[in-house]
Each structure stands twice: as structure tokens, then as C-alpha cells.
Amino acid sequence: WEGRPQELGGKEIPLCAGCDQHILDRFILKALDRHWHSKCLKCSDCHTPLAERCFSRGESLYCKDDFFKRFGTKCAACQLGIPPTQVVRRAQDFVYHLHCFACVVCKRQLATGDEFYLMEDSRLVCKADYETAKQREAEATAKRPRTTITAKQLETLKSAYNTSPKPARHVREQLSSETGLDMRVVQVWFQNRRAKEKRLKKDAGRQRWGQYFRNMKRARGGSKSDKDSVQEEGQDSDAEVSFTDEPSMAEMGPANGLYGGLGEPAPALGRPSGAPGSFPLEHGGLAGPEQYGELRPSSPYGVPSSPAALQSLPGPQPLLSSLVYPEAGLGLVPAGPPGGPPPMRVLAGNGPSSDLSTGSSGGYPDFPASPASWLDEVDHAQF
């Protein structure tokens, strides 16, 4: 072969792209526009001779299996290519090998009919493990961080609270350095302490009013037994501080004088069912403290500070004693605290006549020809 010319019959002998030697075989393979020996045309990955079919990418040649493994659809779990002849599992847009289609927690391979959850990173979690993880997460979120304060630290904080219930920042920094507690812990302790003081004052006021109304009930000779019992709320421990981003209810409630409380609707001017257009008559009794929720500290209408103060208040003085409107059967009586312009309460006339009315409210009396003749009878000196 050394003396054999490079041209045979006027044609140039091709060179093999694999070994760079002249191809003198009977059969010549051609791929990627180049000539190959049959033994030189191999897969770039497994080096298997490519006799029947080959796949190319760039300057490399591959067999069918290696080509799809490298450039075909990849498994979402192992990121390896999946041959087109292999059975796969699908979850939405993700494709998995059969052995890769398993729960990442318990490693159990998921079969047809099993319930699972698909995470954002294409991982699979079986239903049992997912619900268990969710429950643990909820329990961990519900537990707020708590700090236990020693007796010495508690004594220092109480002493500072007695001096100033709302200390400045530099005072809190000093307390933090003295007690060794975090600034946030000191701040939360003072917030909880102030809320507790407000709650205790509010509960004490409720007990005083409740006792007063029970005494009034007994004084009137009520036959029903009083089953109301005052439950003392358990006192929070000052040695435990819990963190929360929400303001305390004591600071948001009506105790700060900004907002009125929401309670049962007052029946003073309500319309009872079955009697449309009429208003109930009130016979005596003292207004409870909840009816003064709309008053401001600067209001001329004073709110009694204690039940004992109500006993010393003088009774209402009637402003209009004989002015009646027979055509509507309505009378006007004063109903309000003394010391200011009393509001007027409208009383229904569809029933017994009022004690303050001089005429009959059950019928229509004969009116004089001129309204001035009966309007002059009203004593205007009272105004």
C-alpha cells in the first residue's frame, strides 16, 4: 500500500475523519459531510460503532440512546435524559423516571392512584407527609416566644414602673443594661403592665356598678333570685413576657375616651315588635354607665364617677307641666341629667293617659275657632 498512488482512475482517495488515513475499504461511511472508516464511526459517549443509524449535535456523533439521554427530555428529579422508549410519569409539565417518581420525605415510590403534592421546585410529597408537615408548621407558628424574668429583674422593673409607668428610651436602655434583658423585652413588659393596670381598674368599676344595681334590685323587692356572679379574672404573671405585634385590647377599648363601646342596643327609644309607631314608657330606674359611652371628658353632661354619687343627685324638675298636643296624644317630659338643657323624650299616646297631661289623650276634644284662644292659656313665664 505504500507505493499505491493517492489517485486511482483519476479520482482522489478520501481521508478518514476519524484516523486521518486513506480509506481503501470496499465500503465508505459518510457523516457530517466527511468520510469514515466503518470502524472509526463511533458514538462519542459509549464508543459503540454506528452501523445503521447515528445522531449528531455539533461535531459529535451519538447513538440513539445516548443522544436522547443527553439532549432529550430530562427527568425533573435527577435531571438526566429520558430515552424515548422508556416508560415515564408526568405531573403537570414535569416528566419523571419511574424510580424518580417518589416522595422526597419517605422515599416511597408513588403508584397510580396515590395522592401527592407537587412543590414549586418539582419535588413530590405524599399526602400523609404533607399534612404532617403542615400541622407541625401551624403548631410552631402558634407558639410565641416567651421570656422568663427572674425575681431580681422583676423587682427592678417594678421599681422603675412605680417611678414612671411609661419610661423614656434612655431609661429603658438603662434598665436593659442593669437587668441584662433585651430592649424589646423591657418595652413589652411595660406595655403588658400598663394594660394589666387598666384592666384591673375596669374590672373594679364593673364590680362596683354590679353590686350597686343588685342592691337596687333587692331594695325594690324583686322576687327573682340574683344568679349573677362576678368571676375574678386570673392575673397574668409579671414574670412572663409574650411578644405580639397587635396592640392590646385595653389600649384600643373605650377606656381611652376616644371611641364608644359597642354593646346591647338601648331600649329607651326602640320600637318593640307588635307595636309599630309607639315607644315604651320608662318608669323610674337609673341609667347604667353604658348609656354614657358617647360623652367626652369636656362635655357639660357629667358622668357619675361612682354609684354613691347618683343618690345625691336631685330629681328632674319639670319644665313643661301642662303643654299637651291632643291631636297626636303626645306629651313632653324632661329626661336628662340636671345642669344642662334637658333632652325631650317622646311618649306614646296610644294607651293610658300620661300623669303630666291635663287633657284626655284618648279622643279628639272640641277645638276653639281660633288657635290663639287656647295657646294663650299656656304659662309662658316658665320659659
Swiss-Prot record:
InterPro entries: HD, Homeobox_CS, Homeodomain-like_sf, Lhx3/4-like_LIM2, Lhx3_LIM1, LIM_Homeobox_TF, Znf_LIM. It holds the Pfam family LIM. The modification Phosphotyrosine is found at residue 212. The keyword Flavoprotein does not apply. Residues 197-383 are annotated as: Disordered. Residues 14-73, 73-136 form the LIM zinc-binding domain. The modification Phosphothreonine is found at residue 48. The keyword NADP does not apply. One of its GO terms (molecular function) is DNA-binding transcription factor activity, RNA polymerase II-specific. It comes from the Eukaryota. One of its GO terms (biological process) is regulation of transcription by RNA polymerase II. Residues 335-344 have a biased composition (Pro residues). The modification Phosphoserine is found at residues 56, 223. GO terms for cellular component: nucleus. Residues 142-201 bind DNA. It is found in: Nucleus. Residues 307-334 have a biased composition (Low complexity). Keywords: Activator, DNA-binding, Homeobox, LIM domain, Metal-binding, Nucleus, Phosphoprotein, Repeat, Transcription, Transcription regulation, Zinc. Its main location: nucleus. Interacts with POU1F1. At neuronal promoters, interacts with LDB1, in motor neurons LDB1 is displaced by ISL1 and a ternary complex is formed in which ISL1 contacts both LHX3 and LDB1; allosteric structural changes in the DNA binding domain of LHX3, induced by the ISL1-LHX3 interaction, may explain differences in sequence specificity of the different complexes. Interacts with LDB2. May interact with CITED2/MRG1. The LIM domain specifically interacts with the Pit-1 POU domain and is required for synergistic interactions with Pit-1, but not for basal transcriptional activation events. Transcription factor. Recognizes and binds to the consensus sequence motif 5'-AATTAATTA-3' in the regulatory elements of target genes, such as glycoprotein hormones alpha chain CGA and visual system homeobox CHX10, positively modulating transcription; transcription can be co-activated by LDB2. Synergistically enhances transcription from the prolactin promoter in cooperation with POU1F1/Pit-1. Required for the establishment of the specialized cells of the pituitary gland and the nervous system. Involved in the development of interneurons and motor neurons in cooperation with LDB1 and ISL1. This is LIM/homeobox protein Lhx3. It comes from Sus scrofa. The gene is LHX3.
